[in-house]
Curated annotation (Swiss-Prot):
Keywords: Cytoplasm, Iron, Iron-sulfur, Metal-binding, Oxidoreductase. This is Adenosine 5'-phosphosulfate reductase. One of its GO terms (molecular function) is metal ion binding. GO terms for cellular component: cytoplasm. The keyword Iron applies. Catalyzes the formation of sulfite from adenosine 5'-phosphosulfate (APS) using thioredoxin as an electron donor. It catalyses: [thioredoxin]-disulfide + sulfite + AMP + 2 H(+) = adenosine 5'-phosphosulfate + [thioredoxin]-dithiol. Its EC number is 1.8.4.10. The active site is at 232 (nucleophile). Its cofactor is [4Fe-4S] cluster. Pathway: Sulfur metabolism; hydrogen sulfide biosynthesis; sulfite from sulfate.
Length: 237
């Protein structure tokens, strides 16, 4: 959807999202991805943080060569970059590597060193939200790996919705999957997984803001540990 989005475009996408949500309330991930492909053709993108390749594998089966968007913030673990490279070589996909306007060094020079510590919300905005917004402008829909079991903030995540924040249809294809569902798929299909998962990191983001979960906490309790912040701003709607 490389165009200037009109109000008519947005209304049409909203209506499509509403119909899809009503018709596919109990749909499987495969059904959701087929619906996405039937309605948007090649005009959608799959987002991945390279924690694992489950969603990537599912999407590639529906549309070989599908665009897979990866936000290269400049702060990722080496293991995450390695997983991205491995995923790109193993699966029939096209990785769209999205970087912020500024390198980490340039950002440090402009706003001060280690913005992730002094203002994590602004750091996420500059290195994730702004680049994502620009990248999504060329698509009519995006597919995410957001799951309801990730954290209380995601417990009611819809399968299909209109993303008001970014102006396109959003499909959370594996929103209903449990941790057991994920592991079963990985075991049965030999799906690539970020090695940090086996080291005790069930939710992986930028290295400075990712720790192992707190005792008794949800998978995302290791993100921005000690702060009230629980989301980076990508899933505001």
């Amino acid at each position: 959807m490389s165009r200037e989005t009109t109000t008519k475009d947005l209304d049409s996408l909203r209506a499509l999202a509403e119909r899809g949500a009503a018709e596919l309330q109990d749909a499987s991930a495969e059904e959701l991805l087929r619906w996405t492909d039937e309605n948007f053709g090649g005009n959608y993108v799959v987002a991945s943080n390279m924690q694992d390749a489950v969603l990537v594998d599912l999407a590639a089966q529906v549309r070989p060569g599908v665009d897979v968007l990866f936000l290269d913030t400049g702060y990722h673990f080496a293991e995450t970059i390695g997983t991205r490279d491995a995923v790109e070589s193993v699966y029939d996909i096209h990785v769209v590597n999205v970087a912020p306007e500024q390198t980490v060094a340039q950002q440090d020079e402009l706003v001060g060193k280690d913005l992730f510590a002094s203002d994590p919300g602004e750091c996420c905005r500059l290195r994730k939200v702004v680049p994502l917004r620009k990248s999504l402008a060329g698509y009519a829909a995006w597919v995410t790996g957001l799951r309801r079991v990730d954290a209380p903030t995601r417990a009611n995540a819809p399968l299909i919705s209109f993303d008001e924040a970014f102006g396109l249809v959003k499909i959370n294809a594996i929103a209903a999957w449990t941790d057991e569902d994920m592991q079963k798929y990985i075991d049965e299909h030999g799906t690539l997984v970020n090695p940090l998962v086996d080291e005790g990191y069930p939710s992986i983001g930028c290295a400075p803001c990712t720790a192992k979960p707190v005792l008794g906490g949800d998978a995302r309790s290791g993100r921005w540990q000690g702060l009230a912040k629980t989301e980076c701003g990508l899933h505001a709607s």
